[in-house]
From Swiss-Prot:
Protein name: Spermidine/putrescine import ATP-binding protein PotA
GO MF terms held by the record: ABC-type polyamine transporter activity; ATP binding; ATP hydrolysis activity
Keyword Cell cycle: no
Family the entry assigns: Belongs to the ABC transporter superfamily. Spermidine/putrescine importer (TC 3.A.1.11.1) family.
Annotated organism of origin: Methylococcus capsulatus (strain ATCC 33009 / NCIMB 11132 / Bath)
Disulphide linkage map: none
GO cellular component: ATP-binding cassette (ABC) transporter complex
Source taxonomy: Bacteria, Pseudomonadati, Pseudomonadota, Gammaproteobacteria, Methylococcales
Purpose: Part of the ABC transporter complex PotABCD involved in spermidine/putrescine import. Responsible for energy coupling to the transport system.
PANTHER family associated with the record: SPERMIDINE/PUTRESCINE IMPORT ATP-BINDING PROTEIN POTA, SPERMIDINE_PUTRESCINE IMPORT ATP-BINDING PROTEIN POTA
Binding site for ATP: 59-66
SMART domains reported for this sequence: AAA
Keywords linked to the UniProt accession: ATP-binding, Cell inner membrane, Cell membrane, Membrane, Nucleotide-binding, Translocase, Transport
Gene3D superfamilies listed in its UniProt record: 2.40.50.100, P-loop containing nucleotide triphosphate hydrolases
Amino acid sequence: MRPSRRPRFRNILENRTIAAMTRSTIASFRAVSKHYGSHCALRDFNLELREGELLTLLGPSGCGKTTVLRLLAGLEIPDSGEIFLDGRTLAGVPPEARNVNTVFQSYALFPHLSVAENVAFGLRMKKLGSAEIRARTAEALRMVRLDGLGGHRPLQLSGGQQQRVALARALVNRPRVLLLDECLSALDYQLRREMQLELKGLQRQTGITFVFVTHDREEALSMSDRIAVMRTGRIEQLGPPRDIYERPANLFVAQFAGESNVLEATVTAITAPDSLIVELAGTPLTVRTDRRFRVGARLVLVLRPEDLHVHDDAAAEGGLAGHVLERTYRGVTLDTVIALDAGPRIKTSEFFREDTPALDHPPGQRVRVSWTPGWEIVLPHDPET
């Protein structure tokens, strides 16, 4: 396990994770499979959703994320396996009887109805009393900070406000599970960041289980109690964001969870239960890992760009020598592409400070790249990734 960069922050995250792990199961998928023609969208899929958590399904297009939502919502029927909600099978239960609501990417608002009428639509379909409908609609609009806009039409609102209307329309039904299908992808960057914070706040405030689908790793890492990384209809890894990012189960998860430098190496010696000497294109390196390897085994080192440091003295010991190919100023960070003498190119990302001349490495300069021992991620060689 890699040493913590921020022990206090680590404790906060771990306390939150422990709290999430003690929650009871609200819904579960058991050996669920789903095909669309010859395409297998889900295969022997297993997942438990916990009461009051925000779970994100993260993965590339076509990996089965949206199929999971559609099956839970009752919009699709599994080919095999069972889905349970509150301990009861959902087999044969129609969508309207499941107490599960979905917020879609398109929002699906009725343009001819007012904001309040859109929010109240589901309650009217349930034939609730008018007083209860008014009270619950007003409560939902306050929750998403749209009180005072109930008389407006959707087209009079901004994209972010329309998103809040869609959320209010789902929350007003007080669902057991709220499904969010890439519902932030149509927003611009700044508004998307704001809505991420609002969604987290709403989830904490209501205590409703949220299942969020995205292919955006920053959204997943910043919002979730747990993340399920999916590939070809299966979960590759399920766990808290920090585990997904810092302790990935395999190379696919490592690369999908964050920007990665991937270096192939061979084990030349085992010096301790958690320490190896590896050879990278003729360069010996000592690495730390709790995984077991034999001498001669091929493996990969995953180095996060933000974990790397660039030094002027290419002749110094330790790390990897090379020369600068490109520098990119990004305001907060300086990104550097370096061609290593060992062969591959790697990228570093360092926080930029104008009073730090050590960060000024022009193209062509000889440098050495280092990192804190133990911050490398050591994984088995995966020919499929």
